[in-house]
């Protein structure tokens, strides 16, 4: 009895002073205000915020409590006002950043965006004008100055550590427990990991926080060696199968490409994609369900290359930025090596975006040709490389090897952000879009995909006469980041997650049309070629795409990447490849000084070639693919002269070595 009395006395003491209650009450009110403000920026109307409150009240409360918990951390400092304002400013900044992100794409801001952010002007300049960037820098400077002044001037308050700890722990526990309450209480089913649906149904603060901590594939409840063997039994029994004459296989992933003729009641001055529509009529084709809308190219790549479902991973996760940083993963590149195919990736953008330069060796590719290894590249109005350069690069990859090739090609031309006014938009919207801004963006986009359509015709013309049997698989990686709603689409022709794919060949490959998800495309292509090699190729081909199929696929994925690798008999059978950049060597033949300039001559230089003298980069002028030059200041006999290919972000990709200067 005495113990109970002592406990009650302690509780009374905790709540005795009003300052303690005022502190946590202030955090709660601050969290409520921040949540309303952030959701208002995300949903762009107060009525939409009320819809969230009415339809998912527990989700609304969850967001408020997450914000309250983060604000409550300020109570552990004597300068609670400063740290409270600092934490609130961070959340407000995230809300503003989300508002800006949603102005040029469909998917909301998530934690992974900070991992893939490129802080170089070649990237930032596409999404932000110079005046806007200057204003942003000024705003950040003023904000930092204001925070410094606040830190110096703000009053100090007593810290009640026991009370604050108790409250923070209660808030944290509530944040963890609420999402797992019964759906009837108002939170709803939240097992999916797509940030668009999560943010729409459960709010920005919850989704963003979840994207911070939710990575990888959760261990299935029934995971065991016996369970994996049961799932993979037929896969393990099935022998590899392939025809004697395996063709070249080219995957062509078209950036933000879809047939705009699917838009209801929208007419154009001419058909933007006549050749693509012709291909759909004459080749095996179907709808292609991408893992995201308006963004997420790397996840579409991941699904096609590995045949894994990215939605089984964490919220908004890009496996390129997590598990594939360290762990090799079975892929079509590894699998087709068994059949003697060399494997290449071609991308007319920088090598380092999404850490592709790090990831592709872990997916088994032999070479990676990027913008840094291309010459005579034309760019569109907003700076993206035009896709027609890819024809030459694909032919070069086919020519450089004696064996047959797997070529995974990633285009970039129709990438956003789309300008509302364009000087180069030749195709006009005649009717169906009233908003002038969207109409201008659509005209620019239609013009870009029209050029891509012409590139497709040129590429297939070249491949038609290619001496080796060749299969070309082309598809849009996701819908463009335009304000296209479901109401604007003929839903009988696919929804917002559906683009289309076509399988073309110069060797008579045929087959019935079939709709696929991104992670099913490769097995579909290989099935038409009578190829059955690799764990997931066999799994997809041997199983009907229904019933327990998705659950069993998830278990296999967990086992292959995070589990005991039962399907591989407990081993890691895949080694990172010694991937080269480009398919041709960059060579240095001579280096000499003339008129106070160091001239370096060789082969296959590009505008991304940089001269290094004893390891120090020099400001380099690109003259031609045979010569680059820099100032000869300070260069002495015996200095080591090299030429390296350097990405926009400063990453050194590869190197050619010259003889010491003067020898």
Residues of each region from the PLM?
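N-terminal leader/auxiliary helical segments
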Residues: 3-16, 20, 24, 132-145, ...
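Membrane-interface segments at or immediately adjacent to transmembrane helices
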Residues: 178-251
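Alpha-helix initiation and N-capping motif
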Residues: 114-117, 201-206, 225, 273, ...
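Solvent-exposed soluble domains appended to multi-pass membrane proteins
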Residues: 236-244, 254, 259-663
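Transmembrane and membrane-interface helices of multi-pass
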Residues: 2-198, 637-640
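Membrane-interface micro-motifs in multi-pass membrane enzymes
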Residues: 111, 196-204, 294-295, 385
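Residue-level preference for non-acidic, small/hydrophobic
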Residues: 120, 249-254
């Amino acid at each position: 009895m005495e113990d109970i009395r002592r406990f009650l006395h302690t509780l009374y003491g905790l709540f005795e002073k009003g300052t303690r209650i005022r502190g946590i009450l202030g955090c709660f009110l601050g969290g409520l205000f921040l949540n309303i403000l952030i959701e208002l920026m995300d949903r762009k109307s107060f009525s939409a915020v009320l819809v969230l409150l009415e339809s998912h009240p527990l989700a609304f409360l969850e967001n408020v409590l997450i914000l309250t918990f983060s604000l409550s951390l300020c109570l552990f400092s004597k300068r609670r006002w400063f740290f409270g304002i600092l934490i609130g400013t961070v959340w407000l900044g995230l809300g503003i950043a989300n508002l800006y992100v949603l102005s040029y794409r469909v998917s909301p801001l998530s934690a992974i965006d900070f991992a893939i952010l490129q802080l170089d002007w070649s990237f930032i300049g596409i999404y932000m004008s110079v005046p806007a960037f200057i204003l942003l820098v000024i705003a950040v400077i003023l904000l930092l100055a204001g925070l410094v002044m606040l830190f110096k001037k703000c009053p100090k308050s007593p810290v009640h550590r026991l009370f604050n700890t108790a409250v923070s722990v209660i808030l944290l526990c509530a944040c963890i427990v609420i999402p797992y309450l019964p759906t009837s209480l108002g939170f709803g089913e939240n097992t999916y990991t797509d940030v668009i649906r999560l943010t729409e149904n459960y709010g920005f603060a919850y989704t963003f926080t979840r994207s911070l901590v939710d990575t990888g594939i959760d261990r299935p409840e029934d995971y065991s060696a016996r369970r994996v063997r049961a799932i993979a039994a037929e896969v393990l029994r099935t022998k590899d199968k392939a025809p004697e004459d395996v063709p070249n296989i080219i995957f062509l992933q078209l950036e933000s490409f879809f047939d705009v003729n699917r838009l209801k009641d929208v007419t154009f001055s001419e058909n933007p994609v006549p050749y693509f529509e012709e291909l759909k009529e004459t080749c095996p084709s179907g709808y292609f369900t991408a893992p995201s809308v308006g963004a997420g190219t790397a996840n579409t790549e991941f699904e096609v290359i590995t045949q894994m479902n990215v939605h089984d991973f964490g919220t908004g996760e890009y496996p390129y930025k997590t598990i594939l940083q360290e762990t090799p993963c079975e892929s079509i590149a590894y699998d087709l090596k068994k059949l003697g195919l060399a494997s290449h990736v071609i991308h007319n953008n920088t090598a380092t975006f999404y850490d592709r330069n790090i990831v592709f060796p872990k997916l088994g590719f032999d070479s990676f040709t990027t913008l840094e290894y291309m010459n005579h590249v034309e760019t569109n109005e907003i700076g993206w490389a035009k896709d027609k350069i890819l024809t030459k690069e694909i032919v070069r990859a086919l020519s450089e090897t004696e064996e047959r090739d797997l070529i995974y090609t990633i285009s970039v031309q129709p990438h956003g952000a789309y300008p509302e006014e364009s000087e180069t938009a030749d195709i006009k919207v005649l009717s169906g879009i009233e908003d002038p801004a969207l109409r201008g963006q659509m005209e620019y986009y239609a013009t870009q995909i029209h050029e891509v359509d012409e590139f497709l015709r040129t590429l297939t013309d070249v491949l038609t006469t290619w001496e080796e049997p060749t299969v070309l698989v082309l598809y849009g990686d996701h819908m463009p980041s335009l304000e296209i709603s479901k109401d604007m689409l003929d839903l009988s022709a696919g929804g917002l997650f559906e683009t289309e794919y076509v399988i073309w060949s110069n060797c008579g490959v045929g087959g019935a049309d079939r709709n696929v998800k991104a992670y099913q495309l490769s097995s579909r292509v290989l099935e038409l070629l009578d190829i059955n090699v690799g764990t997931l190729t066999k799994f997809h081909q041997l199983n009907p795409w229904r019933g327990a199929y998705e659950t069993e696929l998830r278990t296999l994925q967990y086992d292959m990447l995070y589990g005991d690798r039962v399907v591989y008999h407990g081993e890691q059978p895949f080694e990172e490849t010694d991937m080269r950049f480009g398919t041709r060597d960059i060579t240095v033949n001579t280096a000499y000084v003339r008129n106070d300039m160091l001239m370096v001559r060789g082969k296959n230089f590009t505008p991304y070639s940089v001269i290094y003298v004893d390891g120090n980069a020099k400001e380099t002028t690109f003259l031609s693919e045979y010569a680059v030059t820099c100032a000869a200041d300070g260069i002495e006999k015996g200095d080591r002269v090299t030429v390296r290919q350097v990405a926009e972000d400063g990453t050194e990709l590869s190197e050619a070595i010259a003889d010491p200067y003067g020898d």
